[in-house]
């Protein structure tokens, strides 16, 4: 539970306060921004992707718990857990790619690496959307007390599934990520209350 809450906070602070690249800019401009401010870039990447990976592993554990409990939603939860683990691996790859952008020997190489990371990022948004939709569905089907969070997770999942078609720098993507954070905090709070 706490891992979800800490992950959300770390991700927000990392991406907003430290990460120097603006997702609304062209790939070459984003790569140049990372290379121009290495310290801020490293801190932003560690906090941003670190928080995201923490959230993904925590959500994977929640999904596994729902799956283990059995019931109507267990099959959806199993797929969600698998997807969250894949997305966490993709986030690690993106972290490595953007670290490589900072240390690239040429601007052209940095732009190529940045473009690859952004492409994987679009796929991750789709994956998070599908996994969150499935987790929300499994929560609703198990009827285990936090149905509002389950319903909200379904809405967030749908928003994130359509977000990549609009681009990473659009309001709908921002809305999806904000919703994902809120849903994750809701799941985290319920997990903490359940463990007490």
Give the residues covered by each predicted segment.
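Hydrophobic, aromatic-enriched alpha-helical segments typical of multi-pass transmembrane helices
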Residues: 1-196
């Amino acid at each position: 539970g706490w891992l979800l809450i800490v992950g959300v906070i770390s991700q927000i602070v990392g991406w907003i306060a430290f990460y120097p690249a603006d997702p609304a800019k062209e790939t070459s401009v984003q790569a140049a921004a990372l290379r121009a401010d290495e310290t801020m870039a490293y801190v932003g990447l560690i906090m941003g992707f670190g928080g995201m990976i923490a959230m993904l592993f925590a959500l994977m554990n929640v999904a596994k718990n729902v799956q283990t409990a059995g019931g109507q939603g267990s099959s959806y939860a199993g797929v969600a857990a698998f997807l969250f683990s894949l997305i966490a691996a993709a986030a690690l790859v993106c972290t490595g790619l953007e670290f490589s952008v900072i240390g690239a020997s040429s601007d052209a190489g940095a732009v190529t690496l940045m473009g690859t990371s952004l492409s994987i990022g679009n796929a991750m948004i789709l994956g998070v959307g599908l996994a969150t939709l499935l987790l929300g569905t499994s929560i609703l089907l198990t009827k285990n007390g936090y149905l509002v969070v389950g319903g909200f997770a379904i809405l967030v999942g749908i928003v994130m599934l359509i977000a990549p078609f609009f681009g990473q720098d659009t309001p709908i993507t921002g809305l999806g990520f904000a919703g994902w954070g809120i849903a994750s905090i809701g799941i985290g709070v319920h997990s903490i209350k359940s463990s007490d």
